[in-house]
Amino acid sequence: MLSIIIPTLNATNGLAPTIAAVRASKLVSEILVVDGGSTDGTQEYATSLGARVIVSQPGRGMQLSMGAENAKSEWLMFLHADTILEPGWSDSVKAFVTAEGSSSHAGYFRFQLNDRNPWARWLEKLVARRSNILGLPYGDQGLLLSRSLYKNVGGFCRIPLMEDVDMVRRIGRKNLVALDGIAVTSADRYRKGGYLLRMIKNGFCLSLYFLGASPKFIAKVYK
């Protein structure tokens, strides 16, 4: 029923719990890890965890697109390598995919960080508002949609960054559904760079995108 598609690049540190969280579900037909040229053994590690590995050129848009092309199921779920779905996620997915008209809608999970820092709680609220009001859930919230909808909107663009924003804008806010489940994402990048600085940079990158800057340029700024 469901293909899980995970883009990776040197992801051995956090990949095991991500795959473990979805592997046991009866809904999952396959787990595809689309690797962009890791040098840390990610490809071999993913295989040992039960995933089917596809080698791609680096770039998340490219990797997600390759994953969708190689997936065999009628439902696709795109998930970041450092994002872990909390128990109960499969119940919310089952309820979504069996609902009338679900094939023309896409679902995403509630964003949560694995950090007790008060900044993390504030950011989670900000993401919830961005998702609900603006209709802009990011890739670290997961994205669930039917193969037919994926094809109808043109699939993921093969761009290095903002592929998630580009995709959900084409799906349309009225067709996005908040699932009753939580996606817990690593807070490492916020801890390393500082919450405030990373949030400012994320907002700046989003602004650049809406102003028409190229994804390649935005990717350089994001780093």
Describe the residue ranges of each PLM region.
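Short, well-formed alpha-helical segments that are part of the catalytic scaffolds
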Residues: I5-I6, N10-A24
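Acidic helix N-cap motif at the loop->helix transition within catalytic regions
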Residues: N13-P17, D40-L49
